[in-house]
């Protein structure tokens, strides 16, 4: 059984037991969180596609950790002007483990 749900403006395909990195969510580590924006639920031959959401669909997950991703380096450069600017960015994420998919 798998589901596609939406969180943080992105869609994620998950199954029970999967670990997924999502955009940062303000929930303490170890707590349970429910995602109700389920777009699709599939169980073998049975596939429920929402229009736009599956009625009564829920994905239940436990927060495993919070952290920051790899650094992305940004460099701005203006030719012939001795101007160079270098910046970095690390995006916050929340790692969750999927415990149940309800349809």
Curated annotation (Swiss-Prot):
UniProt cross-references to InterPro entries, sorted A to Z: bL21-like (IPR028909), bL21-like_sf (IPR036164), Ribosomal_bL21 (IPR001787), Ribosomal_bL21_CS (IPR018258)
UniProt cross-references to PROSITE patterns, sorted A to Z: RIBOSOMAL_L21
Superkingdom assignment: Bacteria
Ranges annotated as spanning the membrane: none
Pfam families: Ribosomal_L21p
Role played: This protein binds to 23S rRNA in the presence of protein L20.
Subunit architecture: Part of the 50S ribosomal subunit. Contacts protein L20.
Protein name, UniProt field: Large ribosomal subunit protein bL21
Originating organism: Shewanella amazonensis (strain ATCC BAA-1098 / SB2B)
């Amino acid at each position: 059984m798998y589901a596609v749900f939406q969180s943080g403006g992105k869609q994620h395909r998950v199954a029970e037991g999967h670990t997924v990195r999502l955009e940062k969510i303000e929930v303490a580590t170890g707590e349970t969180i429910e995602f109700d924006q389920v777009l699709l639920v599939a169980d073998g031959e049975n596939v429920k596609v929402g229009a736009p959401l599956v009625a009564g669909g829920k994905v239940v997950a436990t927060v495993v950790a919070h952290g920051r991703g790899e650094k992305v380096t940004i460099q701005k450069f203006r030719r012939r002007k001795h101007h160079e600017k270098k910046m970095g960015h690390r995006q916050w994420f929340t790692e969750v483990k999927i415990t149940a998919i309800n349809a």
